[in-house]
């Protein structure tokens, strides 16, 4: 996993092209091997035609034209015409099929990245800007389009054409063939010198593109704060800095890339000139007919065109290797929480929850966040967790939902260790409402239905009524069909939380978890919500985290958490009677209300 970074920080990449990453592209070709085989068959046919055409030209010049054999000339011309038509048809088929296979591969790659990201732990998303994750799913995969759509298979065609042309050239005249290859070592040296600088340039470019994307994503998410503090100019200045970094990196990368072409083209032209010189002057004892000389020039083009094409592919490969490294780095991040090999589905539960001497720490050698937490909850009971910020309240419910695993001890539900059951079956019987409520773009009905995708409209309305969300929903322009923007920006904080609460209740979980679920709801809304919750909590084991003690006074048991330990435990009246930490917290809130 990449180290924690911000939009200003570049991510570390390999210095050299990672051949393993490039070979992994083959995994995405495998499902389409039948198509690829057909394409390769067409490629072989086209390569053979490209070799036959110069030879037929040689025969025409050396045999048909000098002897004025019109019959042979007509036959050769007709054969050339047929071969050219077949070649063009093959070219069209190859282009269309390669594009289709390439797009199918990209679709599969996007699917794998998106699916994999859904399984990654919270720590992955906490360790980097979301914009840097987004660019991997969209921009980097799109950048691979040309390489996967044409480059990979075309380079196979080019290599085959290169080899078969080389063989034919040596068969016709091995000495002239050697002269044709005389400048080839200079080409190899030119490519090797440039590839190191080009690889590094595109790594820097991908870093700067990632940083810019992360900054834009962050700026859009925080645009209200920017406008509130009138910091538009400062934001624009930072944007310009990031954008200039991208432009500078792009120009450096392109400058190096464009150095490749003049070198290849120059060596290609010099090779053809050398063939003419040797063939005409008889240098080195080479004696060839005019037809052979013309054919060799054609073969030289057949020889150098693939070399130029391979050079182009190599350019693309250098560019894409930096992006492939980022994509596969994401795919190689293993979820910290996975199903055990022998995991079984959690059966329908009653809701007994046991924390047995639980110890938790984020890092193996880090400090303990929870210390020997021992908590036993009977089915249907409501447990409230209170205490100062950072005491470990949210960590307790994260362990219950198995977003993290305990370091020592165990968490069980109806006697089943949560590590021994499948994640889907565990979380399917839980309803979790986090402090940071998320509303998806779509209408209100779809957002509530997210808790149970096959829910009827009647069930949706019933859930909304239960949490007293129905009235405000009906006051919206289109009621339940009112379209809300991403993150529910057109709704108030309280309305967003009520919709999210209805979503959780619609799932009808056996265990209900509310993490600061009413922290952004005004007192009047909270009172309406509390009235609906009183009967909905019955029959469900419920865990409630709340800073407002008024929302948990009716809890069956209240646990005061401090420094990762349960320091007080009992109901509201019992804890007040002890005049301990809970009593002091209650008194401080009551004093604030009086003021």
Where are these regions (language model features)?
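Membrane-integrated ABC transporters
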Residues: 1-50, 65-76, 93-98, 102-105, ...
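Short intracellular "coupling" helices and adjacent cytoplasmic loop segments at the cytosolic face
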Residues: 4-13, 103, 111-141, 214-238, ...
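Transmembrane helices of ABC transporter permease
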Residues: 31, 35-48, 78-79, 83-89, ...
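An intracellular "coupling" helix at the cytosolic face of ABC transporter transmembrane type-1 domains
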Residues: 33-34, 122-123, 139-148, 152, ...
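Hydrophobic/aromatic residues in alpha-helical transmembrane segments
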Residues: 53-57, 94, 113, 164, ...
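Helix-loop-helix
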Residues: 65-75, 168-182, 252-325, 330-331
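Alpha-helical transmembrane segments of multi-pass membrane proteins
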Residues: 83-102, 149, 153-160, 179-205, ...
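ABC-type nucleotide-binding domain
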Residues: 339-340, 346-595
